[in-house]
Amino acid sequence: MTFSGKVDLSAADRLFDWSGVHVVIAGLGTSGYAAADALLELDATVLVLDDSDDDSHRDKGGLLEVLGAEVRLGPGSASDLPEETDLVVVSPGWRPTQPLVARALTRGIPVWGEPELAWRLMHPDRVIPWLAITGTNGKTTTTQMTESILHAAGLKACAVGNIGRPILEAMADEINYDVFAVELSSFQLHWSNSLSLHSAAVLNLHQDHLEWYAHESDPLGSYAADKARIYHQVTNSCVYNVADPATEHMVEDADVVEGARAIGFTTGTPGPSMIGIVDGLIVDRAFVEQRATSAMELARLEDVHPFAPHNVENALAAAALTRSFGVPAPAVGQGLRDLHLGGHRIETVHQAGGITWVDDSKATNPHAANSSMRAFEHIVWIAGGQAKGTHFDNLVTTHAGKLRGVVVLGTDRGIIARSLAEHAPQVPVVVIDDMSREAMARAVHEAAKMARPGDTVLMAPGCASLDIWPGYAARGEDFANAARHVDGPDADG
């Protein structure tokens, strides 16, 4: 079981002898807890480290201690790597440059994420196929669409991964799932090396999370390389976005299982081996017998809600993934109609005086904000937060003609304000310097003064929320609450 004095985990799986294997769980979030729980069940020696020490972490830590783990919480707890460590399992977001991870890599200790661990720990008699989704934007929505279509087909399916539910937790369910719809972030893919998925999709590729890759000579290239890992050893279909050549190049370069196919999705008329749109219908020219000369109707565009160009792309990708799994055509439209997305995704939260207030707090980078802004004609834009190393010049240039005004707030408000000054100097801009949660109410007040009947006040920040809020949902709730108190244009008289 040993190799060069260490435990050789290169082929470790559920049937591997985990007793005596020393595993460090870096981070006690939902995925860290699930990883620790699964490894304890296999008799591994588990040490959980997290610099946080709040009630939630203490509660989870206490449960794991009862099960046999050692748990260290509080500042500095996750800074040191014990000498006897054989494996590190990191929570999403842990960078290679963080001291504990860097020490592990230097010492040749394997570092895995929860998806890698989950893949290895699937029971050989109960292998659950994965339909996996990544991309800069649209991952969560596409994962939800995929799950809903699978349910409409009568399959026992579960949305897992970056969407919020750990894969290991779902694997422990008594439900014998037929298939998983798996959302994977670039962070999770970075720490995954043995996945061999049934089918996988990269929805798009744009600048995001570049601060995570700041140590690399080519941050965007490294980010793209991690996204492309999802196609490695795919067994059935590699789904790509025809409108985003970078995703097709990833498929071309992928090392897949013999027989795996490249399947494109497009908002235009599809060619063979594509899913696309004809006369308001989503049609399949990929998974039909006579794909060179015929197409099969899957759904109507009105089945997609909320209706926006980027959300149609999400639906096309979900259709491709589920059709690759043999889902019958009628289930695609039914699944799209059945789906009710969570809030903060192009959600109309208020209408008054001819003005529509839309919460797209989930738009946490410029590409997501661009997708949202494409759906509206006249916009008062509320933007700002943590830019994560991204830029806004292209976004501002693209939409300058439809901007009635802009309100910027958050840590990197100056970056957006400077882009507006350079590329849209005619657009009125209000800068909110308040760094408390009251900033959103002030932003809504200023937006109301600029908006006119027929306008949309769009909160599509293009930035992360953690500078002020605990998450994008809280930011969206503050926007919605403030917007609902607005009566109409220039409400303060």
UniProtKB/Swiss-Prot annotation:
Its EC number is 6.3.2.9. It is found in: Cytoplasm. Keywords: ATP-binding, Cell cycle, Cell division, Cell shape, Cell wall biogenesis/degradation, Cytoplasm, Ligase, Nucleotide-binding, Peptidoglycan synthesis. It catalyses: UDP-N-acetyl-alpha-D-muramoyl-L-alanine + D-glutamate + ATP = UDP-N-acetyl-alpha-D-muramoyl-L-alanyl-D-glutamate + ADP + phosphate + H(+). It comes from the Bacteria. The keyword Glycosyltransferase does not apply. GO terms for biological process: cell division; cell wall organization; peptidoglycan biosynthetic process; regulation of cell shape. Pathway: Cell wall biogenesis; peptidoglycan biosynthesis. GO terms for molecular function: ATP binding; tetrahydrofolylpolyglutamate synthase activity; UDP-N-acetylmuramoylalanine-D-glutamate ligase activity. GO terms for cellular component: cytoplasm. It holds the Pfam family Mur_ligase_M. The keyword Cell wall biogenesis/degradation applies. It is an enzyme of class 6 (ligase). Coiled coil: none annotated. ATP binds at G135, T136, N137, G138, K139, T140, T141. Cell wall formation. Catalyzes the addition of glutamate to the nucleotide precursor UDP-N-acetylmuramoyl-L-alanine (UMA). Belongs to the MurCDEF family. This is UDP-N-acetylmuramoylalanine--D-glutamate ligase. It comes from Cutibacterium acnes (strain DSM 16379 / KPA171202). The gene is murD.
